[in-house]
Amino acid sequence: MKYFELEFTITPCSQVAQDLLSALAGEVGFETFEESQNGLTGYVQQSLFDESALQQTLACFPLDDTQIKYDVREAEDRDWNEQWEQEGFEPIEVRSERSGVSVETLIIHDGRHLPSDISYLPSTLMIEIDAHLAFGTGTHETTQMICQALLEMDMKGRWVLDCGCGTGILGICALKLGAKKCLAYDIDEWSVDNTRHNAVINQVDDKLTVLHGDGSLLDSVKDSYDVVVANINRNILLQDMSRFATVITPQGILILSGFYEADIPLISEKVNGMGFWHLKTKKNGDWACLVFQAL
C-alpha cells in the first residue's frame, strides 16, 4: 500500500498536544505516528487520505492556544501494519480503585507479549487484543480509565453500547465482566473488522454486534442500553450527547473519556443539562474520564 507522510508542526509543542493530535488524526484515517521534537509525523494510506476532513479536525483542535501546520509528502514503501504487528505492546495492568469488587485487576496483552509473574486469581481478568494498528490497545490513559470504571461496576446482565469502539476493548471488557450484550460502532472500517476479530479471540463474538458508521446510527437503534461508553474526542462527544441520552435506560450509566481535563466543565454542563447526575471523575495525566447516571 502507498502512504502519505505528514509532518505536523505543533506550536507550542507539548505531550498533551501530541496525544490529542494523534487521537484526532486517527479518527480521520491516520494509522501510525512518530513523535518529533516539534510535533508529530503521521502516516495515512493515500487512498484514504481526506485532507478536507483533516483540516476540519485541526480547525476544531481543543487547545485554543495551539497552532498546527503540516507538510505532505509521499512516504517510502514500508509495511507499517506489519511493523506494529511484530512489535505489539507490553502487557498493561489496570486496577480497580474500589475494594470488594469481583474483578480487581485487568490485564490487557497481545499474542506476542504474554503476561508473566502475575497471579491468575479469580479477581484477575485477562483480555487479549490483536491490534493490527496501535490504536485502542489499552496503552492510552483514556482507555485505561474507562476500563477501570467498568471494573468498579456490577456488569452482570447489562446491555452495553460502545461508541467509537476502535479495537473493541471496552465492549469486550464489559462482556467478560458479565454484560449480556454489546452493540459497538466505529466510523473506521478497519476498527469494525478488528473489533470482530478480537471478539472471537476473547470468545464473546456471540454477544457483540459491530456496525460501521458514526453516531447517526443511533437514530435508528430501537434498543436501550444500561451502560454507554464513549472514548471519543470532545467535539464528537458534544455532538452526539443527545443521541446517547436517547438510547440509555433510566438510571443507566454513561462513561465518557477521550478529552482533556480542561474540557471537564464543558462536557459536564452539556451532560447535566440532558438529565444526568455526575457520579465520578477520574484523571490520568492531563486526560479525564467522567461517569454519569441518567435520572
Predicted features and spans:
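A short helix-to-beta-strand connector/capping loop
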Residues: 65-69, 104, 123, 180, ...
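Conserved beta-strand elements of the Class I
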Residues: 127-128, 161
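Conserved SAM/SAH cofactor-binding pocket of Class I
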Residues: 133, 137-216
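S-adenosylmethionine
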Residues: 116, 148, 187-295
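Accessory recognition modules or surfaces
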Residues: 45-49, 53, 156-159, 244, ...
